[in-house]
């Protein structure tokens, strides 16, 4: 949309008055000048690094703030949203329309009388299922982040652009009335699905803008029978599509970035009647301990137009990727075309035939790979077990076990069974097989090597795992291969990694109990109750 008068009027309608200037869909060149210009202070300021990318800091907000997330409860949402409750704790806390109105006025006041950046883009590479997103901010690098992460419209598309959702980023304002309103803190990330607006206040973390729209896709798509997934995806030379589910830090980005396959996307996808499509126009990769040797594609993507968050920049402008003193959750966003080996011109492909669940097991119990039955697929998808890894959320620094429904509970707007149903339906139609891959720890106390995990993924994708002789892991009743090409055979049965196998047994019984306890919350649903037998035997 290039009619700025119309845009100003639409912003006025949202309460943003006396707008000094609109910098509309700025080019990368313009953003670079804006975010590095002399005189910028605090978190507005970008620092040029020797890699060519600009680095910014987000202060104490080095991860998402799930405790500050709210959805307005109204006629649209009261019976559809998976609301937080004692029985099922989640991040979808209801907000009254009165509180929403006061927050909207607060953010509008913050953005009024300012020079504003407005970036318009799409969430979703499927023309049928995408949503048009308009991002409004007073901070240049936030506009840069959005330009990197959302799908950049063509000039033709911009002429007829329709904003289905508007994000008002008021990172510089906080809510003084939070206590009286019964909120968690002065910071807020709030959604009004009826109005099509997201408000951000207090937090500077870039990921709030990206994950906010993911939560909205997770609301709209399953209601239309389209799978909405927290996964990465790639496609082989023969058009075979694989999707990788997993929470942050389990290897979604690393393992789907594969020189032998084209990347569809690294984090958020839909799966409709035509196939798998990316929601995003960029990647948001973790950079802690990043090296050119281990992750050449991601390292090579960190150049001009990439945006680094919370990394340590030395006095000479070089980046110390091993320094986690600000946060373990250091990040980089870059447009997807910074990776050479991607699906072009549109990030979408056919139906998936391999579905991989990545988990980082902090207990050292689960095998590096197991093949799942259809019932186990649904059970482990609903369980979404992993270990939360350091620093992806504020206040989490040590690996702790967690169960996150559908490998993305933080972003689910509907009940988990709705996502499981749509996924299983899509898998049945395409004849897809599912595998559970543990990228975490084993009895040696060490993390399973990337080399071995890559060997496992190769065996899944090239079909050699189907030819392997299989054994069974007790308690979990998982089918595990006895040997795979290029993988250390000593790690395939986790019991073999313990000096004393009885130790594995004790830990396995403990973990099995946790699975059973966690799954109780689903058993009120008759469909989910049938899956109990597919889980471990405590």
Curated annotation (Swiss-Prot):
ATP binds at residues 152, 211, 230, 246-254, 295, 331, 344, 447-448, 453. It comes from the Bacteria. The gene is pckA. The keyword Nucleotide-binding applies. It catalyses: oxaloacetate + ATP = phosphoenolpyruvate + ADP + CO2. Involved in gluconeogenesis. Catalyzes the conversion of oxaloacetate (OAA) to phosphoenolpyruvate (PEP) through direct phosphoryl transfer between the nucleoside triphosphate and OAA. Monomer. Its main location: cytoplasm. Binds 1 Mn(2+) ion per subunit. Pathway: Carbohydrate biosynthesis; gluconeogenesis. Gene3D superfamilies: 3.90.228.20, Phosphoenolpyruvate Carboxykinase, domain 1 (3.40.449.10), Phosphoenolpyruvate Carboxykinase, domain 2 (2.170.8.10). It comes from Actinobacillus succinogenes (strain ATCC 55618 / DSM 22257 / CCUG 43843 / 130Z). Its cofactor is Mn(2+). The keyword Ribosomal protein does not apply. NCBIfam families: pckA (TIGR00224), PRK09344.1-1 (NF006819), PRK09344.1-2 (NF006820), PRK09344.1-3 (NF006821). One of its GO terms (biological process) is gluconeogenesis. Keywords: ATP-binding, Cytoplasm, Decarboxylase, Gluconeogenesis, Lyase, Manganese, Metal-binding, Nucleotide-binding. Mn(2+) binds at residues 211, 230, 267. This is Phosphoenolpyruvate carboxykinase (ATP). Its EC number is 4.1.1.49. Substrate binds at residues 64, 205, 211, 331. It is found in: Cytoplasm. It holds the Pfam family PEPCK_ATP. It is an enzyme of class 4 (lyase). The lineage of its organism: Bacteria, Pseudomonadati, Pseudomonadota, Gammaproteobacteria, Pasteurellales.
